[in-house]
């Protein structure tokens, strides 16, 4: 019998080709989970999956454009069909696009809503029945759903109106869902990192990337710091639930 905390568990990680997503997949695989890697591009997924397998882990690639509701739901179904269960969902996909209402193209607003809100909702809705079943049948006696936001989503500024719309509600959604699933032993948590380099910065538009550029000499978070936070949440004993975690570099305000 394995002594790894997540032995026998199955995790689905979205945007698994990104630095944070790949780091999270590696962290969960090291804990013993089989990991379904979901992202739009299959090339990067192949590399992440190969790296996990070469280290003795179990990973499958599930290429999907999760902004398409049907494909988002199918990604969850494919994970369950191929790996037999679903114990952990990490909603890691997201994008930051900042511009004023006067100048922002509507297509950018649509992209923000499609990825930051609609995709998360469809993935969650499809996964919840499987998570409930996993909590009832797993030796861990618990399942986990982790949403990944950004501390900047709580800060209003010029040009951030629609991004704030897509992220400021994530905390309320996560907390309400946590209360709904308490009785089912499905833990629901929110991880909100500050600026991560390269990580989240790679998901910023060009203008946004320039605006948040790190001041000289100041450290920022690394992708593995966020992966460690997610790993910490899902490896707690079933008696313990971490509902929210904000992660900053020590020098960040």
Regions found by a protein language model. Give the residues of each.
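Conserved glycine-rich cofactor-binding loop
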Residues: 17-19
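Conserved glycine-rich Rossmann-like NAD(P)H-binding loop of the short-chain dehydrogenase/reductase
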Residues: 33-47
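The beta1-alpha1 cofactor-binding region of Rossmann-like NAD(H)/NADP(H)-dependent oxidoreductases
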Residues: 42-43, 63-75, 106
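Substrate-binding pocket helix/loop in short-chain dehydrogenase/reductase
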Residues: 100-101, 105-113
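Active-site helix of classical SDR
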Residues: 124, 166
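Residue(s) in the substrate-gating loop at a strand-loop-helix junction
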Residues: 150
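C-terminal helical subdomain
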Residues: 190-191, 209-253
